[in-house]
Amino acid sequence: MQLVIISGRSGSGKSIALQALEDLGYYAIDNLPASLMAPLIDELREGPPSRTHIAVSIDARNLPDALRRFPVLLEEIRGRGIQCQVVYLTADSRILLERYSATRRRHPLTRASEMTLAEAIEQEQTYLAPIRDIGDLVIDTSSLSVHELRGRIAEQVARHSGRHLTLTFESFGYKRGVPLDADMVFDARCLPNPYWDPQLRGFDGRDAQIVTFLEAYPDVRAMADDIRHWLERWLPAYLASNRSYLTVAVGCTGGQHRSVYLVEDLAHHFAQQMSGVRLRHRELGVQAALPEDGNAVS
């Protein structure tokens, strides 16, 4: 039996993620009390053999004590031979406020208290910390559309099996903050910046003009090589620890030139050596899977 547990901040897309899994054949249960997880597994194990892929969502409406005990519960479930993934969805608090304002829905924690919406959003994050801290996959939906979130769930959750590592390289601009789902971050702001050349400003790091500019500087190649060597040294250790996902983020000031160039270079290099490589340019709104020949497939 494979169990996917969806949790995260209200308004971050848990219902969309659960629906995406249901559409892909998972037996889906929304807002399951954590205390009923073990009895549910026992019942489903005795049920139809077709129910081998289960998806449940857990949110902050659980009692705080139940949420604090979640890590222990998860260990008990895995100890019974259940293959279990915890997917945690989050988003910037400002984005969540905007989403609630747009839909005019009430936050779950404001229904039985006098908390403001902003207070409820922050309190919920505290309640869910035990789940967030042990999440196998953390997805920041701040800049994702519904379609993009469904695609991410299909790519990174439903298609996952066995000891396969999905390696994502993501470019970003520090102006908009570090991606919340990044496992490691490299800062490229020390490299020469094409932005200050008016003739290059309108291009991005995928364009030949920017590639030529950056590759004229030895430090650019040196940084790319250093990141590559570090990953080649430590990727086997991540695989050995049963890690399923690894997101390597590279940032520059605006996320248009230097970080994009480095992510393209790194992603195509590793796609020649392994499957499961993806690239994402946050500020350009681009994401793609790379087959082992290194050619992107959006």
From Swiss-Prot:
Keywords for this protein: ATP-binding, GTP-binding, Nucleotide-binding
Function according to Swiss-Prot or TrEMBL: Displays ATPase and GTPase activities.
Protein's recorded name: Nucleotide-binding protein Csal_2229
Family: Belongs to the RapZ-like family.
InterPro entries per record: P-loop_NTPase, RapZ-like, RapZ-like_N, RapZ_C
Chain sites annotated for binding GTP: 59-62
Domain of life: Bacteria
One Gene Ontology molecular-function label: GTP binding
HAMAP family: RapZ_like
UniProt entry tagged with the keyword ATP-binding: yes
Binding site for ATP: 8-15
Keyword Nucleotide-binding: yes
